[in-house]
């Protein structure tokens, strides 16, 4: 089918926006120009002068299916991603059953094939059942379609296990993706160790819990040559360790989540589970280090860590609520409003971190508006300001601390392989 997206604007170098129309055909971008004859197309969509970007790429989401479908499903999670402008997402393996064999992984892909409205790439675990010290069969999992290997939700606690996993992943040319958390340093913590945790009388999580395991893993990554990717970096020390590793030529990449760029522990209003996440919100110096890390290339990309939970679960106290907040439907709006509108980031940088770079570092055919590339496209309204309304989410979950925040940059349309996956007009 020949599809036209007309009257849009795309980013050129030096952050210039130019008028553009996109000709989509056979699932790819066939041509980009100022305008085309509408009579030549079977479908025409009007961008009304708004921003056209490559579809965003999120390398860190939790879709909860199978096993926890009262929180989220592949269908609702992928719709949430599409509503946020994401066309490719990578789903974590903390499921039930854990997809730790080729057969179980194939079953998850069957669900994805049936229900997903965006491209969903599934991670496989590093160890059986996530918490064991028994390595999975990485070769078989790769053949079954594993995107990369991770035990996200828990850190691999034993250095020897991590070393062997890295060695195997390197041999298979696969990435090893790490949730970094030394459990021996947790001490039951539920939020950042600092003045706020003391004020609320809650056990804190040391910054060293994260940075110490990153330092260990980087040493092992140097030894094995694996592509080592650090999930949701949150501390100043972690940024320093990653920066030093990159300077030393070690193949390490890293992501940061929007909430860690925007919020700090001082923003937490009280003992409210909607503010509980892992890693926790850190201090002002940590947040600035994350911003600086993006700007100097230490941190490669922005990933949401979309983590849906049931409402009753998150309405509990910090001690009892599960970790995590949703982020797919708010990520671009929050980053655009808080950083581009304020002049801290450029629009080009944001698209780089949310589309181009995540695709590049994992070798995905995504994140680009070029002739012949997959027609994975988002259209954003940069002009209209509106409050975030969790009740309007496509996600089953509403666990966000950003409800009521006024933001710009809502998604108007999302296309996957040239087909309309989500549009505001259709809602």
Swiss-Prot record:
Substrate binds at residues 62-64, 94, 278, 309, 323-324. GO terms for molecular function: allantoinase activity; dihydroorotase activity; zinc ion binding. Its EC number is 3.5.2.3. This is Dihydroorotase. It catalyses: (S)-dihydroorotate + H2O = N-carbamoyl-L-aspartate + H(+). Pathway: Pyrimidine metabolism; UMP biosynthesis via de novo pathway; (S)-dihydroorotate from bicarbonate: step 3/3. NCBIfam families: PRK09357.1-2, pyrC_multi. Zn(2+) 2 binds at residues 152, 179, 232. Binds 2 Zn(2+) ions per subunit.
């Amino acid at each position: 089918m020949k599809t036209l997206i007309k009257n849009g604007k795309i980013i050129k170098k030096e952050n210039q926006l130019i008028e553009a129309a996109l000709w989509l055909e056979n699932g790819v971008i066939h041509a980009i120009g100022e305008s085309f004859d509408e009579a030549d197309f079977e479908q025409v969509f009007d961008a009304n002068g708004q921003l056209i970007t490559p579809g965003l790429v999120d390398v860190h989401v939790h879709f909860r299916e199978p096993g926890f479908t009262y929180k989220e499903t592949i269908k609702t999670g992928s719709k949430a991603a599409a509503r946020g402008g994401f066309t490719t997402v990578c789903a974590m393996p903390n499921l039930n059953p854990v997809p730790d064999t080729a057969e179980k992984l194939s079953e998850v892909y069957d669900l994805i094939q049936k229900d997903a409205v965006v491209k969903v790439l599934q991670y496989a675990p590093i160890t059986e059942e996530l918490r064991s010290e028994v390595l999975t069969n990485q070769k078989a999992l790769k053949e079954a379609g594993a995107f990369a290997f991770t035990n996200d939700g828990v850190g691999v606690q034993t250095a020897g296990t991590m070393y062997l996993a890295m060695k195997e992943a390197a041999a298979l040319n696969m990435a090893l993706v790490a949730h970094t958390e030394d459990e021996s340093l947790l001490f039951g913590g539920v939020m950042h160790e600092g003045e706020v945790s003391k004020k609320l009388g809650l056990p804190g999580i040391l910054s060293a819990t994260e940075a110490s395991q990153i330092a260990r893993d980087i040493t092992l990554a140097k030894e094995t040559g694996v592509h080592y990717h650090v999930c949701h970096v949150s501390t100043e020390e972690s940024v320093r360790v990653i920066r030093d590793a990159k300077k030393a030529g070690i193949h390490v990449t890293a992501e940061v989540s929007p909430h860690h760029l925007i919020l700090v522990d001082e923003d937490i209003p009280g003992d409210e589970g909607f503010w509980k996440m892992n890693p926790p919100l850190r201090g002002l110096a940590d947040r600035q280090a994350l911003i600086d890390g993006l700007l100097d290339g230490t941190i490669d990309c922005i990933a949401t860590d979309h983590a849906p939970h049931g409402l009753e679960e998150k309405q509990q106290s910090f001690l009892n609520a599960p970790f995590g907040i949703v982020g797919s439907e708010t990520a671009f709006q929050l980053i655009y409003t808080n950083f581009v509108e304020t002049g801290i980031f450029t629009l080009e940088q944001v698209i780089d971190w949310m589309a181009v770079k995540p695709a590049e570092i994992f070798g995905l055919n995504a994140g680009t508006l070029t002739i012949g590339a997959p027609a994975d496209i988002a259209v954003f309204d940069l002009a209209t300001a509106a409050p975030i309304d969790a009740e309007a989410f496509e996600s089953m979950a509403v666990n966000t601390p950003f409800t009521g925040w006024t933001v710009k940059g809502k998604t108007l349309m999302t296309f996957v392989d040239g087909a309309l996956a989500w549009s505001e007009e259709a809602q």
